[in-house]
Amino acid sequence: MVGTEASEGTRREQLKAERRRRLLEAGARLIADRGFLGVRLDDLGAAVGISGPAVYRHFPSKEALLVELLVGVSERLLDGGRAVLADHDGGDPRSVIAGLVDFHLDFALGEPELIRIQDRDLDQMPDDARRRVRRTQRQYVELWVDALQRVHPQLSEGEARVRAHAVFGLMNSTPHSATASDAERVRPALREMALAALVGVS
C-alpha cells in the first residue's frame, strides 16, 4: 500500500514536471511570436491543454515564467561555455574558439525564440532578475574575451570584448533572418565567418 502511494506520488510529480516543461516551451514560442505583453495566462494554459488559472500551479506569475526562461538560458550558456573551456584545457587556443563558436551556434540555431525574447522583453523582468541575467551574460562574454586574448595576446580586453560582441551579433541575428528550415543550411557560413573574425584577426 505504501509502495503504491509512493509510486502514485512519483507519477504525479513526473506529470507536473512534464507540464511545467511544456509551459516553458509554449511560453518561449508565444512570447517570441507576440511579445511578453501580448501573451495572456489563458494563452499559456491553452497551449498545453489547461486553464489560465491552472498555470499558477506551476508559476506564481507570467513574469516568473519569463524570468525562468531568460535566467535559465543565461546560466546554461555560462555553464556550457565553461564546459568548452574545460574540455580544451591545455590544448590549442584556436580549438577553444572553435568550440565556443560551435557551442553558441547550437544555442542560436536551436533556441532562436529565446534570443528574440531577450532582445525585446528583457526589460519586462523584475530589476533583480534582469541584473542577474546581465551579470551572467557578462561572465559568459569574459570567457570569450579570455579565449581571444590567448589566441591574440596583442588584443586589449576592450578590443577582444568588442570582437566577441560583434560575433555574437552575427550568430544571434539568425532568429531574425532565417527560418527553422534554414538553420542547418546557414550554419556553415555563420561558422566560417565567426572563425574568420575571431581567429583571423590581426
List the predicted regions and their residue ranges.
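Amphipathic C-terminal alpha-helical segment
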Residues: 107-110, 157, 164-184, 195-202
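Generic hydrophobic, amphipathic alpha-helix propensity
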Residues: 19-27, 44, 69-73, 77-80, ...
